[in-house]
Amino acid sequence: MGFLACALLVVATAHAATAIVNPETCEIGSNFKNYCNNCYCFDGVMDHALCTRESCDRNVWNEDGTRKFPKPGKWISEKENKKNDEPCTPGENFKYYCNDCQCLDGLRAHAMCTRMRCDRNVFNEDGTRKYPEPEKWNSEKERKKSDESCAPGASFKYYCNSCTCGAEGKVAEAQCTSQECDRYKWKKDGSKRPFTLDPVLHD
């Protein structure tokens, strides 16, 4: 039996003991997108699909793999700034798209600037963003918003962190370690996700 066949058999066996969370079907042998991840349907059940495990920012990606905003370009603002004949005050600091600049001799075209590639679909010329910067998911931020209760003095896991419940009996008030947890690898109860789990999270 080939390696792929063995891998699929192991995956199928593992899922047989697990309740189906997402019963949607997919065409066997087809490839599909799930947010920023690429998936392969091998048994017709979408929840069993083999998927990459990138952490997809849902402020950027739709579930079907399309982007909510245009893909960042490779345009360099410095090239356009060289054509800029606007005046500036020597010594003044200013933003030009995503770059930081310092005026040298009174002309913006001669300013000294960082050379990052700026996406004009994201940044305005004055350095402000056209839409809010996506917030990185953080297990600690989520825990502190939790309305769940816990037994005072009890130890528990919250994603990859170890916690001790305080006298208040609230998960949000517990004392926890502060590791950065990948929610595509960890479940809220501290157990690890199977590597084949569909990246749509069901906690």
Curated annotation (Swiss-Prot):
Signal peptide start and end residues: 1-19
UniProt cross-references to Pfam families, sorted A to Z: Pacifastin_I
Principal location listed in the UniProt entry: secreted
Comp. bias intervals (Basic and acidic residues): 129-148
Protein keywords: Disulfide bond, Protease inhibitor, Repeat, Secreted, Serine protease inhibitor, Signal
Molecular function in Gene Ontology: serine-type endopeptidase inhibitor activity
Function of the protein: Inhibits trypsin activity and prophenoloxidase (PPO) activation, an enzyme essential for both clotting and insect innate immune responses. It does not inhibit activity of chymotrypsin and protease K, and has no effect on phenoloxidase (PO) activity.
PROSITE patterns to which the protein is assigned, alphabetical: PACIFASTIN (PS51446)
Expression tissues: Expressed by the venom gland.
Protein name: Pacifastin-like protease inhibitor cvp4
Residue stretches making up the Pacifastin domain: 23-59, 85-121, 147-184
UniProt source species: Pimpla hypochondriaca (Parasitoid wasp)
Cysteine-cysteine disulfides: C26-C41, C36-C56, C39-C51, C88-C103, C98-C118, C101-C113, C150-C165, C160-C181, C163-C176
